[in-house]
């Protein structure tokens, strides 16, 4: 479909422009399970700003179920370390606002409010596969109470 690797669309929006279609009408398969993505999966992939991959010159994306599943596998296999926000800023010499940090569960890029929430809650950012990760608002779970009241 796309012969020249340099001219291949990298996002779903670019792919839609190349194919002269809309996200709603886009037919693309999941690179992992090979199922055709439902419209909700297409929108989720686009909102997460993930990149299209190519196999045999054909574009593939990933359904939400596979993104979550393979994110967990990557976390188990490629976890490096966890650091607090101030330490991360010192390590990278960049403000948290200027760092691309994705949710380690759904791969959504974190906004400034989500990054600040992680700092305020004294949670850590994680280095997984050479990228910094945290938790987005949708995947956030409150900490369990470890003490019981009598």
From Swiss-Prot:
One GO CC term on file: host cell nucleus
InterPro entries registered for this protein in UniProt: E6, E6_sf
GO molecular function annotations of the record: DNA binding; PDZ domain binding; zinc ion binding
Keywords: Activator, DNA-binding, Early protein, Host cytoplasm, Host nucleus, Host-virus interaction, Inhibition of host innate immune response by virus, Inhibition of host IRF3 by virus, Inhibition of host RLR pathway by virus, Metal-binding, Modulation of host cell apoptosis by virus, Oncogene, Transcription, Transcription regulation, Viral immunoevasion, Zinc, Zinc-finger
Disulfide bond residue pairs: none
Record localization: Host cytoplasm; Host nucleus
Mapped zinc finger ranges (unnamed): 30-66, 103-139
Chain ranges for the short sequence motif PDZ-binding domain as given in the UniProt record: 148-150
GO process annotations (BP): DNA-templated transcription; regulation of DNA-templated transcription; symbiont-mediated perturbation of host apoptosis; symbiont-mediated perturbation of host ubiquitin-like protein modification; symbiont-mediated suppression of host cytoplasmic pattern recognition receptor signaling pathway via inhibition of IRF3 activity; symbiont-mediated suppression of host type I interferon-mediated signaling pathway
Note: Belongs to the high risk human alphapapillomavirus family. The cancer-causing human papillomavirus E6 protein has a unique carboxy terminal PDZ domain containing substrate.
HAMAP family named among the record's database cross-references: HPV_E6
Family per similarity comment: Belongs to the papillomaviridae E6 protein family.
Role according to the record: Plays a major role in the induction and maintenance of cellular transformation. Acts mainly as an oncoprotein by stimulating the destruction of many host cell key regulatory proteins. E6 associates with host UBE3A/E6-AP ubiquitin-protein ligase, and inactivates tumor suppressors TP53 and TP73 by targeting them to the 26S proteasome for degradation. In turn, DNA damage and chromosomal instabilities increase and lead to cell proliferation and cancer development.
Oligomeric form and interacting partners: Forms homodimers. Interacts with ubiquitin-protein ligase UBE3A/E6-AP and thus forms a complex with human TP53. Interacts with human NFX1 and MAGI3. Interacts with human IRF3; this interaction inhibits the establishment of antiviral state. Interacts with human TYK2; this interaction inhibits JAK-STAT activation by interferon alpha. Interacts with host DLG1; this interaction leads to the proteasomal degradation of DLG1.
Protein name: Protein E6
Organism name: Human papillomavirus type 26
Gene name of the encoded protein: E6
């Amino acid at each position: 479909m796309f012969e020249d690797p340099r001219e291949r669309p990298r996002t779903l929006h670019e792919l839609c422009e190349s194919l002269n279609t809309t996200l709603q009408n886009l037919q693309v398969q999941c690179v992992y399970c090979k199922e055709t993505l439902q419209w909700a999966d297409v929108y989720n992939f686009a909102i997460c700003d993930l990149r299209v991959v190519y196999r045999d010159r054909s574009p593939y994306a990933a359904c939400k179920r596979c993104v979550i599943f393979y994110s967990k596998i990557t976390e188990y296999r490629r976890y490096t370390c966890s650091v607090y926000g101030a330490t991360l800023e010192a390590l990278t010499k960049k403000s948290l606002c200027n760092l691309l940090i994705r949710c380690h569960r759904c791969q959504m890029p974190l906004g400034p409010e989500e990054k600040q929430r992680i700092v305020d809650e004294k949670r850590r950012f994680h280095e997984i596969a050479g990228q910094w990760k945290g938790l987005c608002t949708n995947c956030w779970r409150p900490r369990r109470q470890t003490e019981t009241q009598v």
